[in-house]
A protein has these predicted regions:
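Active-site core of metal-dependent hydrolases
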Residues: 1-85, 102
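His/Asp/Glu-enriched, well-ordered alpha-helical/loop segment
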Residues: 60-142
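A short, hydrophobic/aromatic-rich structural module that often spans a beta strand
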Residues: 127-130, 185-192
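Short loop/turn and capping residues at structural boundaries
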Residues: 1, 24, 51, 76, ...
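Short gly/ser/thr-rich secondary-structure transition/capping motifs
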Residues: 2-3, 119-122, 147
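Short Asp/Glu-rich motifs
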Residues: 8-10, 59, 118, 151, ...
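Short secondary-structure transition/capping segments
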Residues: 22, 43-54, 73, 96-102, ...
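C-terminal cap of metal-dependent C-N hydrolases
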Residues: 135-188
Length: 192
C-alpha cells in the first residue's frame, strides 16, 4: 500500500507462515478476495484486521473466520504509530464496525481486541480479567445521547462507547476520556 513497496501475495504470506497475518485487510489496499480466502483457508495463523485497512475486506475476513468456526484467529490492530499517525480510537472504531456491520455480538468483538490479541501476542499476564493478571482495565458505558439500550446494544448499533475511567497496574490513570463522548455512567472510586 505504501509508495515504492512491493506486492506480497497469498503465496508469500503462506510460505512465510508468520504468527500473525498482519493487515490481512490491507492498509488500505487489500489483496483480491480469492487470495484472502486462500490465506484464511490454507493458513492457521492469527488474522489481524486493522483500522486503517479496507473495511469491506475486514468484514470478508470476519465472515470467513465465522464460517470456519475460527473466530479465535481474529485479532485487531491500528497500524499505530505509523505514517498515518496515532489512532487513539482505532481499536474502538474497528470493533464497533465489526459488531455493528459484521454480525458478531459486541462482547465477541471486545474479545478480539483483548483476550485474542493477548493470547496471540503472548501477553500472558493480560487480556482477560482473572486473578494474577495485570489490573489494566477500561471502564466504559453507553455514550450519553447515543442510541441503544446499554453499552452492548449501543455498540451493536455502531456507536462508540464512552470511556469513564482507565486503570493501569491497579491505579486510576485517567477518568473521562477526551477522545470519546461522555459515558452515561461513570465509575466512582470508593476508599475504605
Amino acid at each position: 500500500s505504501l509508495p515504492g513497496s512491493g506486492r506480497i501475495g497469498a503465496d508469500v504470506v503462506l510460505e512465510v507462515d508468520a504468527d500473525i497475518v498482519a493487515h490481512v485487510n490491507g492498509g488500505p489496499t487489500a489483496l483480491p478476495e480469492a487470495e484472502i480466502r486462500q490465506i484464511c483457508e490454507k493458513g492457521s495463523r492469527a488474522l489481524e484486521i486493522v483500522h486503517n485497512g479496507n473495511l469491506r475486506t475486514g468484514l470478508f475476513v470476519l465472515d470467513l473466520a465465522r464460517q470456519r468456526g475460527e473466530l479465535s484467529r481474529i485479532v485487531l490492530g491500528t497500524d499505530s504509530p505509523a505514517g498515518s499517525g496515532v489512532q487513539p480510537l482505532g481499536i474502538l472504531r474497528i470493533l464497533t464496525m465489526l459488531a455493528s456491520l459484521g454480525g458478531v455480538a459486541p462482547e465477541v468483538a471486545f474479545c478480539f481486541a483483548s483476550g485474542n490479541t493477548a493470547r496471540v501476542r503472548k501477553l500472558h499476564d493480560r487480556g482477560m480479567i482473572e486473578v494474577g493478571r495485570a489490573a489494566d482495565l477500561i471502564f466504559m458505558d453507553q455514550a450519553i445521547g447515543g442510541a441503544g439500550d446499554g453499552l452492548l446494544d449501543s455498540v451493536a448499533q455502531g456507536n462508540l462507547p464512552g470511556i469513564g475511567m482507565v486503570v493501569i497496574d491497579g491505579l486510576v490513570q485517567t477518568r473521562r476520556s477526551r477522545n470519546t463522548p461522555p459515558a452515561m455512567r461513570v465509575p466512582e472510586v470508593i476508599q475504605g
